[in-house]
From Swiss-Prot:
Belongs to the actin-binding proteins ADF family. It comes from Arabidopsis thaliana. Keywords: Actin-binding, Cytoplasm, Cytoskeleton, Phosphoprotein. This is Actin-depolymerizing factor 8. The modification Phosphoserine is found at residue 6. One of its GO terms (molecular function) is actin binding. The lineage of its organism: Eukaryota, Viridiplantae, Streptophyta, Embryophyta, Tracheophyta. Actin-depolymerizing protein. Severs actin filaments (F-actin) and binds to actin monomers.
Length: 140
């Protein structure tokens, strides 16, 4: 069982689907939620490769905390196709205090178990994870 110091247990399915996103590019994004009763992080939504960044942001609830990973494709100045895996810790101001604390205390453990995250973003408002912010983190 997890405790607040070490963070919530990460369900094996989360790790498997993340590896599929990273290695096989089976998914564009994954949204994760903490199930307090089960004491673990679980998958809430898998985004198909053809889904857009707007599809991704609309799948995250406005007033509840979530973790998410997004495989962002981009073209460099010298015309190379690349991708970076973003980790987004979504903790809106309108979410419950207990939920914010739970997600904050479990974040490091979650990231450790999702090996291959390249860029981290903390957002409390939709503007903090806009496409412009994402591109800015890539220096595009």
């Amino acid at each position: 069982m997890a405790n607040s110091a070490s963070g919530m247990h990460v369900n094996d399915e989360c790790k498997i689907k993340f590896l599929e996103l990273k290695a096989k590019r089976t998914y564009r994004f994954i949204v994760f939620k903490i199930d307090e009763k089960a004491q673990q992080v679980q998958i809430e939504k898998l985004g198909n490769p053809e889904e857009t960044y707007d599809d991704f942001t609309s799948s995250i609830p406005d007033d509840e905390c979530r973790y998410a990973v997004y495989d962002f494709d981009f073209t460099t100045e010298d015309n190379c196709q690349k991708s970076k895996i973003f980790f987004i810790a979504w903790s809106p101001d309108t979410s419950r205090v207990r939920s914010k604390m739970l997600y904050a205390s479990s974040k490091d453990r979650f990231k450790r178990e999702m090996e291959g995250i390249q860029v981290e973003l903390q957002a409390t408002d939709p503007s903090e994870m806009s496409l412009d912010i994402i591109k800015g983190r890539l220096n595009l």
